[in-house]
Amino acid sequence: MGMRMMFTVFLLVVLATTVVSFTLDRASDGANAAADLVARGIRGNCCMFHTCPIDYSRFYCP
């Protein structure tokens, strides 16, 4: 296999990897939202006071 052919195969592999990665990333948008809520609850940094959505929105677990 010549250098030109190896370079072409390399470019095809990179292109295929990029396309697959991009497609999988778009398909998983928002899929981890429930897992994030569970992880925050397990870690114990949820704020359960009624003012938390206003004051500490990143720690609020609905």
Swiss-Prot record:
S-S bridge residues:
46-52, 47-61
* GO annotations of cellular component type: extracellular region
Kindly indicate where the leader peptide sits in this chain.
1-21
Q: Mind listing the GO molecular function terms for this protein?
A: acetylcholine receptor inhibitor activity; ion channel regulator activity; toxin activity
- Which residues make up the pro-peptide? 22-40
Question: Keywords of this protein's UniProt record, alphabetized?
Answer: Disulfide bond, Ion channel impairing toxin, Neurotoxin, Secreted, Signal, Toxin
Location in or out of the cell = Secreted
- Does the keyword field hold Disulfide bond? yes
Q: What InterPro entries does this protein map onto? A: Conotoxin_a-typ
Q: In which tissues is it expressed?
A: Expressed by the venom duct.
| PTM remark | Both Pro-53 and Pro-62 are not in cis/trans isomerization.
Which Pfam family, an example, fits this chain?
Answer: Toxin_8
Domain notes per entry: The cysteine framework is I (CC-C-C). Alpha4/8 pattern.
Record's function text: Probable neurotoxin with unknown target. Possibly targets ion channels.
What the record says about family reads:
Belongs to the conotoxin A superfamily.
What else the UniProt entry mentions is:
Negative results: does not show activity on a range of nAChRs (alpha-3-beta-2/CHRNA3-CHRNB2, alpha-4-beta-2/CHRNA4-CHRNB2, and alpha-7/CHRNA7), calcium and sodium channels.
Q: What is this protein called?
A: Conotoxin Pl168
Source organism per UniProt: Conus planorbis (Planorbis cone)
Taxonomic lineage: Eukaryota, Metazoa, Spiralia, Lophotrochozoa, Mollusca
